[in-house]
């Protein structure tokens, strides 16, 4: 099972802000397990912190802007994209102004710094959200983001720029491992027709050809183009000649769409969990990206506890024979058939409930229902396997109940059900005492849960 990750150390990047033109420094720091992403405005009194989650986004017109009260932080998407793509789960980001520096207009400077400083694996397990069904969002501009079930994460972006100069494009990222090579250095881009109103409003004080691809694809008045050339500090151009206005050539023919894909990943970082699924984005932008991220957070809250994935064709980690070697239970009290996943702090087990179970004879003859006490016992046996598997000579130890708390039965368990148990250690085992939280699923539904404390005794 994958572990959460943070940075091995801190790093800083300095540059000017795209919108403000201010000289800014952003510092990325390691953070404890389960922190997520937090952004701190160290230039303000009290150094307030904003949790980087989708519902804290207050503006998406010219980028992703986080807000809390009167506090704002903008131009965060490139840094967030790099963190998410490189598997960083926990990070405290400190910035001394209202936006991150634009740098070269891509995520490459962040990726280079993260790779240089290194990534630290933490003890807590990474909490993936696994897509089990199609989820889709749309907006009035024809933008659509769809996510489908998949074993890993991948993303395809399709863009139509409504321009004769740039054709429709698509870009695909099949594996996050190729993000640094295929996506990170894709630069932000802007059309001349969109720049002119921003220039007149004095809103892109830090924009230049070092941090953006400027595309002249619709003719404007010569005077307007001259004004833009003066701002960009380039020679005046013929307003009749369309093309790219840039210092550096395109890295890829579809660099603009690759950057759109980069932005999607940055906005996805605000979901708060890594995702396993396949995203197909048509005409993406920060507004629909944030709408998608908000919907995903609602979906996650509805399914806070996800059932483990069970493929009966896969070989178990622990079969019935090995279970009998570790546990003293025998028929009819051995209630775990096999173990399909196990990490240092969690385990997933399986039991197939059949009509031949002896307890159905009296519970109840006309309406067979698995007794709740045996459901708890089954979860506890699974937890016992987790603890015993970490001991030397586990066959010489036994586990005994000490306490049960927060026991809940949500649905009947009947013949024909396949039970999935997910049991997690709540704290390291100390002085032979273990505390665990167990969930029992039928399909995607939680049917029972309990918190239990057990004692581990060497008795053989």
Residue ranges and their predicted role:
Residues 258-271, 339, 369-394:
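Active-site helix/loop of acyl-thioester processing domains in fatty-acid/polyketide metabolism
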């Amino acid at each position: 099972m994958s572990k959460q990750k943070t940075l091995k150390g801190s790093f800083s990047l300095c540059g000017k802000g795209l919108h403000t033109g201010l000289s800014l420094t952003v510092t990325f720091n390691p953070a404890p397990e389960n922190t997520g992403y937090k952004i701190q405005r160290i230039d303000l009194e009290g150094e307030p912190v904003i949790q980087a989650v989708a519902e804290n986004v207050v503006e998406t017109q010219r980028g992703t802007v986080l807000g809390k009260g009167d506090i704002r932080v903008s131009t965060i998407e490139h840094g967030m994209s790099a963190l998410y793509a490189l598997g960083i789960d926990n990070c405290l980001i400190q910035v001394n102004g209202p936006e991150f520096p634009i740098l070269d207009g891509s995520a490459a400077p962040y990726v280079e710094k993260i790779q240089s400083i290194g990534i630290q694996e933490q003890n807590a397990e990474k909490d993936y959200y696994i897509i089990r069904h199609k989820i889709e969002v749309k907006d009035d501009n024809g933008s659509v983001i769809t996510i489908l079930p998949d074993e890993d994460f991948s993303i395809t972006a399709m863009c139509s720029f409504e321009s004769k100069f740039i054709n429709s494009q698509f870009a695909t990222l099949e594996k996050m491992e190729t993000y640094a090579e295929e996506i990170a250095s894709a630069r932000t881009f802007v059309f001349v027709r969109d720049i002119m109103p921003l220039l007149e409003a004095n809103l892109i004080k830090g924009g230049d050809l070092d941090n953006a691809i400027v595309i002249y694809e619709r003719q404007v008045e010569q005077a307007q183009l001259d004004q833009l050339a003066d701002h960009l500090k380039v020679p005046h151009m013929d307003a009749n000649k369309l093309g790219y206005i840039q210092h550096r050539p395109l890295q890829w023919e579809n660099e603009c769409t690759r950057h759109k894909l980069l932005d999607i990943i940055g906005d996805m970082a605000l979901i708060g969990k890594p995702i396993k699924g396949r995203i197909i984005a048509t005409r993406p932008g920060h507004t629909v990206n944030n709408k998608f991220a908000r919907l995903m957070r609602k979906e996650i809250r509805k399914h806070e506890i996800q059932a483990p994935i069970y493929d009966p064709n896969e070989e178990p980690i622990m079969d019935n024979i090995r279970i009998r070697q570790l546990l003293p239970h025998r028929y009819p009290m051995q209630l775990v058939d096999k173990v399909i996943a196990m990490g240092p702090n969690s385990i997933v087990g399986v039991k197939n409930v059949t009509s031949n179970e002896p307890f159905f004879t009296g519970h109840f003859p006309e309406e067979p229902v698995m007794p709740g006490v045996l459901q708890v016992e089954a979860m506890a046996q699974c937890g016992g396997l987790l603890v015993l598997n970490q001991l030397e000579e586990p066959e010489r130890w036994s586990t005994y109940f000490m306490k049960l708390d927060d026991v809940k039965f949500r649905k009947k368990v009947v013949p024909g059900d396949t039970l999935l148990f997910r049991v997690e250690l709540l704290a390291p085992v100390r002085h032979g005492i273990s505390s665990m939280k167990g969930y029992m699923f039928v399909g995607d539904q939680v049917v029972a849960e309990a918190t239990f404390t057990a004692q581990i005794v060497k008795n053989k």
